[in-house]
Amino acid sequence: MKFIHTADIHLDSPLTGLSTYADAPVEMLRTATRDAFTNLITEAIEQPVDFMVIAGDLYDGTWKDHNTGIYFCKEMGRLKKVGIPVYVLFGNHDAESEMTKKLQLPDNVFTFDTRKPCTFRLEDLKVALHGRSFKEKETLENLASGYPAPVPGMLNIGVLHTALEGNSAHATYAPCSLDELHAKGYHYWALGHVHEYQIWEGASTVVFPGNLQGRHIRETGPRGAVIVTADEEGIQDIKRLFVDVLRWASLEVDASECKTLSEVVAVIGKALDGLVKNSSSAIPIAVRVIITGKTAAHGDLFGLESQLRAEVLALSVAMGAERLWIEKVKVATSAVDEGETVRARADALSDLQDLLQAAESDPEFLKNLQDELLGFINKAPLELQTSVPYFKAIRSGDLVELVREVRPGLLSHLAKVE
């Protein structure tokens, strides 16, 4: 017997971080979650599996229109034709209170109740599925504590949308502990809510499959579901099933040996080429390039993120626009011995360094600086106003981090001027 466990599909939610650029793969970004889900349904049919479990957040909230529901019904129809049932539990994003639009689902789709835990028995497979959907988005009670005892003689699967204790990066909906899940006596826990793949073996096998499609730079690497093989003795095998159509990657590039902007761009080019060549699939990659290290090129890089991105984008296009997209180029370098060098010079640069260090804790100075800078920004061409990353920080008043970030680059750049 085989089944697919998936969660956090977030149908029709956008991929973020690329759409503001004219060169962005707009159609791919718009349809990525659907395309990944279609791939999943195709895998379910081709395997084939005996059933599918969706452990919450099938949707990203109420639909903008009925097209999302119509698409889901169409894909469920594909499974119905080959006799594959689907068991859907709703989580915080698609809780009953969040969904204002609904459609009647095909009769091979079964949904877990919101009022109390319920059990679906698959008598021919000797499987019992236990679960409870969210009625409200802000479900903070321990739902697992109310799940029923395991059914004797059956493979018992608990379906639950939960943060699980220890996942502080996620909202603590339906909290419970790993020990509590193991103590329940089920063979397998099909969890959802946490977007990273995680698995624990013990009295029960507990799995977060991760989300189906990475949607931004914080969701890097391959994404998908899991396919589980089981028999009357329990869980026999779990394999990850990758169905995503675009992947996100963070690429750190050490510019320590670089002296100019051109050399930095060349090093980035080599790193991007290596990323593509080492990729195990032909799936497009959206990359954030982070330039690090103490480098003599630090002054040249200062404030040039937009230009850098254009340079790096040109490299990526040359490598094949269908494979590589640049999400962002971030400068995280520092000057080579900037502090010692500047302090050793008894001139205005030393005074400037002291002034900038003191400015970080001087609200009046920061307010005056913001007023002065806003005057320059408002006179700048509109293209610059929207493309220079620092301008946003200035408008929002986030001057402390700005001064701290620009100080090394400014001093390094001025130190070159005789």
Which positions does each model-derived feature cover?
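Amphipathic, non-transmembrane alpha-helical secondary structure
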Residues: 34, 38-46, 73, 144-148, ...
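Conserved residues at the C-terminal ends of beta-strands
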Residues: 55, 192, 292
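His/Asp/Glu-rich metal-coordinating catalytic cores
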Residues: 2, 16, 22-23, 51, ...
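Accessory, non-catalytic peripheral segments of nucleic-acid enzymes
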Residues: 243-418
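A short, flexible beta-alpha/helix-coil linker loop
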Residues: 57-61, 163-165, 294-296
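Short loop/turn motifs at secondary-structure junctions
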Residues: 48, 126, 185, 283-285, ...
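A structural motif corresponding to the C-terminal end of an alpha-helix
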Residues: 43-48, 79-83, 319-322
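N-terminal active-site segment of His-dependent metallophosphoesterases
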Residues: 1-68, 393-399
